[in-house]
Structures are given as structure tokens and as C-alpha cells.
A protein has these predicted regions:
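Exposed, interaction-prone extracellular/peripheral surfaces
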Residues: 1-203
Length: 203
């Protein structure tokens, strides 16, 4: 089950494209592989509330319908409601499933809601969270400062990256699988992660 966060943070650009566009591309690639391997697939999209719910599909002919649904995911300026979205999604599932959550967080408050929502479902379902590396923040944190403003920016960037790592570590401690990938490698990383989890028979 692919759960795509379409909230405000996912509409921010990474290397010229909104995060959500990169997430949808990775989702479609992995969905194609899953259908090819004979698995059943569903697509959900949400922001402050659920927006799209495909139901479970199987077989390669279903891929075209997933593409149409993915194209209908709209950019949203609303904050993501993880609790509502993931609780609603979990209630629709009648068996243990792999949930692939594409999301983004920039503050500890929203991240805490995500972690709490994840904790509620990770005992029942296999949860894989996919985020894009913030390469711009990494560049700022690693750059040699030339001015006082550069120092301030570097310190701020380093603090944000520490917070980010803390959140991802909390998720992993809950038993959530995490992929943090470069924007141009997220599709291949997700396919590899999906195939690995399937090979390990964790479902």
C-alpha cells in the first residue's frame, strides 16, 4: 500500500521539482515492479484528510489505473494529519500489509505526530517510510563559512539535520524501516528496499 503525503511540506521543491512529484515517480516504479511480481497494490494520498483511496488492484493491466490516480494527486497547502490519514488507512486493511509512506517533515512537532501515528500501526503492518535527503541543508552545514552569516546558517542547518536524524532513529527503534535517499535515486532505492523486505519474508 503506497501512502503519499500531499501536504504542504511535500510541495516544496527539491532540485527544481516538488517532493511529491519525485515521490509519485518512485511510487509508480515500485508499483510496476510489485504488480510484475504478482503482488497486490493500493494507492492512498492525503494531506489534512484522506484524498485518494484506490482499493487493492493486481495484474499489469491495473498499472494504467494507478497512473491515472497518481496524476490526480493535487498539491496541497494544508498541513499533514498523520493520525487521521494512517488510522483511516489501517482501518481499510483486512490483513497485514506493507505500507510505504512517502512524507517530509521540517519541525519536531509534526514529526512527533508522525512517529506517534507510526507507533499505532507498526505492530500490525510492515511500515516503510521514505524521505528525500535534504541535500541543500547538508551543503550549508558542510560549507566552509566565510562570514558571520555563513556561520549562523551552518549552525542552524546542522541543528536541523540532527533533529531529522533523531526522528528517523526514533522510527527505526519502533521497528519502522526507513529509506532516506537522494532525489535522483529514490526510485531505485525504494525498489531495492521493497525487494529486500519481500525476500526476507517480513510480511
Amino acid at each position: 500500500v503506497f501512502a503519499v503525503d500531499a501536504g504542504r511540506q511535500m510541495c516544496e521543491p527539491v532540485a527544481g521539482l516538488p517532493r511529491i512529484d519525485r515521490a509519485v515517480s518512485a511510487m509508480l516504479l515500485t508499483a510496476w515492479v510489485a504488480l510484475k511480481l504478482g503482488d497486490r497494490v493500493a494507492l492512498h494520498a492525503f494531506d489534512s484528510r484522506p484524498r485518494i483511496a484506490s482499493g487493492v488492484v493486481s495484474g499489469m493491466p491495473a498499472f494504467a489505473n494507478l497512473q491515472r490516480l497518481a496524476a490526480a494527486i493535487e498539491y496541497s497547502g494544508e498541513e499533514t494529519n498523520y493520525t487521521f490519514a494512517l488510522t483511516t488507512l489501517a482501518a481499510r486493511l483486512t490483513r497485514r500489509s506493507m505500507i510505504v509512506l512517502f512524507t517530509e517533515f521540517t519541525d519536531l512537532t509534526s514529526a512527533d505526530f508522525m512517529v506517534r501515528a507510526a507507533a499505532r500501526i507498526v505492530g500490525t503492518h510492515l511500515l516503510l517510510v521514505v524521505v528525500l535527503r535534504d541535500e541543500e541543508l547538508e551543503r550549508i552545514a558542510d560549507a566552509t563559512p566565510a562570514t558571520a552569516d555563513d556561520v549562523t546558517r551552518a549552525v542552524t542547518a546542522a541543528a536541523l539535520l540532527r533533529d531529522r536524524k533523531l526522528v528517523l532513529t526514533r522510527l527505526q527503534h519502533l521497528g519502522v524501516h526507513v529509506i532516506e535517499a537522494e532525489h535522483d535515486r529514490v526510485g531505485e532505492r525504494l525498489v531495492a528496499g521493497y525487494v529486500d523486505l519481500k525476500r526476507r519474508n517480513l510480511l
